[in-house]
């Protein structure tokens, strides 16, 4: 844990905002740390409208070329009005068991954990598969000039990749005696100029929910939970537009086997740390760099489990932080999942 926190503090101190000057220095820092631990590193650049993008691929060969790829972006949202921050936005600090500063949660905290997992792999016995880390830039600008351009120029980066683990999931919420953790299996991109729709009735909603199971985006037990939630929520708010969005997504979405193929490894590792934890496979709104992998036909999950007390309010806002307990939990769970993936 000491290394993860040390690295994260240093990563936050690099100004990698949209027009920040430190992306290249940040990549060099990551490369040096990993190379010192025996990890193979390769640097790449792409051209962006605001600045050049800087990217890094790190690799620990395994017994097979088949690859699990960890992904994080090094660029951060801009800091906004620093008068709204309770601590320095652009300088890392530790307060009350938390690491604070822009990028702590999105996405330098996960990056520091991924660096530790690569270091562990380089110093331990070979895994059955190759483990790689891809650090990308310009995600906050939409990714087209970052990961999108990088993969267009270097499609070989995805050769032999059987799974990508990225951001967009791992957010906890309680339900009865269990703690559910979101497990991103897809993303619903914003639609421009949507045509008017006839609101879905109850029978339509059941059919639309079933589409998600049939295509593999979530499971039967999650479907049962959603139906119960719908019956309760429907008494207080109009949930019909939600189902219209879901129908749009599932009609066009490809069949996904990512939850069936890889969910059990993550669920088992999570329950080892939190016995009452369960995965909640979900399709999230918005767009992250995960979509570039999905568009290339590569399975990807969004999952970085956080401590239940860790607020998400600082993402793209003020007072961004990540708790040290979240860093510890994510490290243990993802390490355990990697041990279970064969």
Regions found by a protein language model. Name each.
Residues 63, 156-163, 273, 296:
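Glycine-rich phosphate-binding loop signature in dinucleotide/nucleotide-binding domains
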